[in-house]
A protein has these predicted regions:
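Cytosolic juxtamembrane helix and N-cap/initiation of the first transmembrane helix
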Residues: 1-31
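Short acidic DE-rich linear segments
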Residues: 2, 161-168
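Short, charge/polar-rich alpha-helical segments
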Residues: 9-20, 53-57, 86-99
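Alpha-helical segments in soluble extracytoplasmic regions
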Residues: 24-87, 124-159
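Polar/charged, Q/E/K-enriched amphipathic alpha-helical segments with strong coiled-coil propensity
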Residues: 107-132
């Protein structure tokens, strides 16, 4: 087998790969909380373990830490960047901020669900107040998701410029 040298990746390519991984992890947590699955229905939920909300809270914390590291990487990459990477690298910090807020809100939703499980075990549920609180948490998460999608569109525009620069 011959050893083919792989060209060194541009900083924007590394950052883009990292963003995909962060978003994949966040989306997995989102789906485990909100996506319909037959195992979540009665009586199946009595047999299969349910969503581990505490794990989601920890994962969101890790993603937020990684987002901060990515911001630092973007600052370093801007000094080495080629002109066609500029739009992408300028858009990434706003996207990481939106990802951070979205992770905070998803973490808050997971923590609320975990607290509700604890209250249900100890018979402390006050349904009317708890439903209003949950509704507010979901509304905040929905707003954060909307901001994340809008910031992601700008990142995609910047990434298309990077791809054109690489192919051009």
């Amino acid at each position: 087998m011959s050893n083919l040298e792989t060209p060194e990746k541009l900083p924007s390519q590394v950052i883009f790969e990292n963003l995909k991984e962060l978003l994949r992890a966040k989306n997995t947590a989102h789906e485990s909380m909100f996506k319909f699955h037959w195992k979540k229905m009665w009586p199946f939920r009595l047999f299969w373990p349910q969503v581990d909300f505490e794990r989601i809270v920890r994962l969101m914390s890790e993603i937020r830490k990684n987002a901060i590291n990515q911001k630092n990487l973007v600052l370093q990459a801007k000094s080495k960047a080629k002109p066609f990477e500029k739009t992408f690298l300028d858009a990434v910090p706003a996207y990481l901020d939106a990802l951070d807020v979205s992770c905070q809100k998803l973490s808050a939703a997971a923590q609320w669900k975990q607290d509700m499980l604890y209250k249900r075990i100890h018979k402390e549920v006050k349904l009317r107040r708890d439903v209003a609180e949950w509704s507010n948490i979901l509304k905040e998460y929905e707003d954060a998701q909307g901001n994340l999608v809008r910031a992601g569109a700008i990142v995609q525009i910047g990434w298309s410029e990077v791809v054109q620069g690489l192919n051009g």
